Regions:
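A hydrophobic alpha-helical transmembrane-helix feature that marks the membrane cores
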Residues: 1-254
Length: 254
């Protein structure tokens, strides 16, 4: 009887170990796909932003902006700028509410379109800040994001309660930002930027853990593909917003 129990225990232990190995390998592949999509999206955004900026401005031999092309006038000073600014937000809502009806390949395509439109909408950054300071803040953002995402992936602490607190904070700074459009307070602008950095640093860890916990071995390849795209979209938004908040604090204006 004892031998039978030992064999049963060993068999269950081996089965559990095998399941853990499958889970670990699948989770790593899933998270790698999320990060690859996100990184490619950011790269696409950066390329489109740079091309849009170069096509929009006229510069002298020193690189100083001396005027705008027809593209620049349309992109920065006409009604088109509102379409360019709001289109990515529309796509975020479209993906958030329509992902269940999409195929994984369509979700990827929509994500690439979103990243490209974000490049157009963020091209103003190169108009306001020097290229050197943009590059510097980008590397600071990358290091900060990487550290917090790693923490979110490896920590055993449940960050669910932190997520609720951060979402309330996010709503707060959105409202404050709208109010400050009319108040034009430099102090409020500074405070919003500080709080924004703290909130998106926290959201990076929280969202990484949430994306990790969404993985399930039993999911089909199609479902995992859509989860990876939505995870990439979430982390992309965390990265971009953290980048903008840090740029407000450390960016050097032209």
């Amino acid at each position: 009887m004892m031998d039978f129990d030992k064999k049963g225990i060993l068999a269950r232990a081996k089965e559990a170990q095998a399941s853990t190995v499958v889970m670990d390998e699948g989770l790593r592949a899933y998270m790698l796909k999320v990060y690859n999509y996100m990184a490619t999206g950011i790269l696409l955004t950066g390329i489109i932003a740079l091309i849009s900026f170069k096509m929009s401005v006229v510069t002298d031999s020193t690189g100083a902006i001396t005027g705008f092309t027809n593209i620049g006038n349309a992109l920065f000073f006409s009604g088109l700028k509102w379409i360019v600014m709001l289109a990515p937000l529309g796509i975020v809502f479209y993906m958030s509410f329509g992902i269940n009806k999409m195929s994984a390949s369509k979700a990827q395509t929509v994500f690439w379109v979103f990243a490209a439109l974000m490049g157009l909408s963020l091209s103003w950054i190169l108009l306001v800040y020097t290229g050197v300071s943009v590059a510097r803040v980008f590397f600071i953002t990358s290091a900060t994001f990487g550290a917090m995402s790693l923490y979110g992936y490896t920590t055993k602490r449940d960050l669910t309660k932190l997520g609720s607190f951060l979402m309330m904070g996010l709503i707060g700074i959105i409202i404050a930002s709208i109010v400050n459009i009319f108040m034009k307070s430099s102090m409020m602008y500074f405070v919003i930027s500080i709080l924004g950095v703290l909130i998106f640093v926290g959201l990076t860890a929280y969202d990484t853990q949430k994306i990790k916990n969404m993985y399930a071995v039993s999911d089909s390849g199609e479902l995992l593909g859509k989860k990876a795209v939505m995870g990439a979209l979430t982390l992309y938004l965390d990265f971009i917003n953290l980048f903008i908040m840090l740029l407000r604090l450390f960016g050097q204006r032209r």
